[in-house]
Amino acid sequence: MSKIYGFGNALIDIEIQINEDQLSSIGIPKGGMQHISRDRKDYLLDNYKNSIKSMTPGGSIANSLFAAESFGASTCFSCSLGDDEYGQLFLNSYEDRNKIFFNYSDNPTGVCLVFVSPDGERTMASNLSANNQLSAECISPSLLESCEYLLFDNFSLATDSGNQTVDYCLDTINNEVKVCFGLADSGLIVENLSKIKNLSNTNLHCLSGNKLEHETLDQYTSLNYKKRLVSNGEKGASVNGYQLSAPKVDLINTNGAGDSLIGAFLALEGQMEEEQALKEAINYSSQVCSVNTPRLK
């Protein structure tokens, strides 16, 4: 059984169904992600309140760990939450409170507005809020020191406190821990490029992201990794160039699919051959595309 420690954004995903014209008016490139202010979040929520389809706990690393648990992994997630209704909703998604280690922030719990267009593509607007207070104090040293995998992503590089958390974790773990990094968003790669380059001295076990994210990274820099996991939508995914197709599903939206792919793969790679682990992870993440939330219940 794999032990995976992850840290990152704790968000409430609010899925909103919109048409292409409405998406254009929001001003975020289709399929992309943009950080927004609290006022902008409140405005969009009020404007599209009648189009809300679901409100569920999310956040990329939290979603990945949820998928890993589905395949028998032991996980722990560290984050920063607001002491509010959304924070309680996030906590309630953990039947075992020992699997989440967090601090309360004076700011509200973070929210991600997930705009789903008719083709199932998701475009995101995130108000990080409490997540800006993610810090080393949110980390459990004992659980971190005993983990086999450390999982985090590019979103944590977007704030000074998040960067400090990354540095703390990388300095604390032993050399046997498999460090896994998610690229998260192509636009964020450019924004965080100098911080990503700081990871060049880290021997990553797995570098994950979608095809566009990997292509964007390759334009600017390179990282040291053992495995490169690339998701490619309905075409499937690949590990170090070994490509497998995805099964056909009734697509609702793609929110959480890439998160689930990495979580499932990390949980499975120690249980079976790599090709089989990739196949199982693709099948699982494809099923995530057929539900209205970023996680399979």
Task: Put a short name on every predicted segment.
Residues 56-78:
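Active-site alpha-helical elements of protease catalytic centers
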Residues 21-49:
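Short catalytic helix/loop segments, enriched in acidic residues and glycine
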Residues 1-30, 53-56, 76, 88-104, ...:
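Ribokinase/PfkB-type carbohydrate-kinase core domain
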Residues 48-56, 244-256:
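Short pre-catalytic strand/loop immediately N-terminal to key active-site residues, enriched for Gly-Thr
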Residues 59-64, 110-111, 262:
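Short glycine/serine/threonine-rich phosphate/pyrophosphate-binding segments
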Residues 80-82:
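Alpha-helical transmembrane segments within multi-pass membrane transporters and channels
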Residues 70, 247-297:
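Conserved post-catalytic alpha-helical subdomain immediately downstream of the catalytic base
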Residues 33-39, 85-89, 279-292:
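Short, conserved aromatic-histidine micro-motifs
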